[in-house]
UniProtKB/Swiss-Prot annotation, chain A:
<feature type="domain" description="bHLH">
    <location>
        <begin position="6"/>
        <end position="60"/>
    </location>
</feature>
<dbReference type="GO" id="GO:0005634">
    <property type="term" value="C:nucleus"/>
</dbReference>
<dbReference type="GO" id="GO:0009416">
    <property type="term" value="P:response to light stimulus"/>
</dbReference>
<keyword id="KW-0805">Transcription regulation</keyword>
<feature type="region of interest" description="Disordered">
    <location>
        <begin position="1"/>
        <end position="20"/>
    </location>
</feature>
<protein>
    <recommendedName>
        <fullName>Transcription factor PRE6</fullName>
    </recommendedName>
</protein>
<dbReference type="GO" id="GO:0006355">
    <property type="term" value="P:regulation of DNA-templated transcription"/>
</dbReference>
<dbReference type="GO" id="GO:0005737">
    <property type="term" value="C:cytoplasm"/>
</dbReference>
<keyword id="KW-0963">Cytoplasm</keyword>
<keyword id="KW-0539">Nucleus</keyword>
<keyword id="KW-0804">Transcription</keyword>
<dbReference type="Pfam" id="PF23174">
    <property type="entry name" value="bHLH_ILI"/>
</dbReference>
<dbReference type="InterPro" id="IPR011598">
    <property type="entry name" value="bHLH_dom"/>
</dbReference>
<keyword id="KW-0341">Growth regulation</keyword>
<dbReference type="InterPro" id="IPR044293">
    <property type="entry name" value="PRE"/>
</dbReference>
<comment type="similarity">
    <text>Belongs to the bHLH protein family.</text>
</comment>
<comment type="subunit">
    <text>Interacts with HFR1.</text>
</comment>
Amino acid sequence: MSSRRSSRSRQSGSSRISDDQISDLVSKLQHLIPELRRRRSDKVSASKVLQETCNYIRNLHREVDDLSDRLSELLASTDDNSAEAAIIRSLLNY
Amino acid sequence: MASADKLINTYVPEKDVFALHFLQSLSNLRTQNPLNSPDKSIDRVRKIKKAAYVSMARAAGGTSRLWSRALLRRAAKDDNKSVRFSRRKRKVTWKISSKRKRSNQRAPVVEEAAERLRNLVPGGGGMETSKLMEETAHYIKCLSMQVKVMQCLVDGLSPK
């Protein structure tokens, strides 16, 4: 282990992360992703976790897009469908 | 093992911090453009989307996270402004030379997936794989927080 560490620390001043910490990070990511949280077994490979992470991030981006769209529509509309909506709109200067 | 004792911090503020930043951002949008409402709905949507990302980056810690710094830098470049960063004690490399990245190879199949992740996380291109994963975890938490805030707002504004 120490020989591995010394060969890596040659490159830069920043501290090297061990492979243990990598797998720790991978399992942390696994807990964050709803898809993978259900299968609590440790049998999910690191690359699978990263792959699902990519998909999850893309989904989140898409949700932000969609919600921005709806917000824009709702804020621009002038029908006061509810008192709450009117309050929110006036708060935001619309 | 001393050098590997870096604490991995994925603390994310409460939802109301994100909500506050986003609401402020949204109300600022209107005060910038009081009399002439942007005609094109696409412009409106784009501005709201940008407000969402910028307010998220600010709520999540502004310049203390690599992904939020990259996001804010990108947004400022759009507006032709410059972002002031406080001097960090650690040397920040804007470009990671390919030699350094290569020397940090994990299993190639992991690196391949990490490459795709780098394209999705702001600022990911210059990050070492382990740092990338730490930043990703934080980014995901903040993104889902932001989505919740926006969903609440949409629910509040929607017809009952």
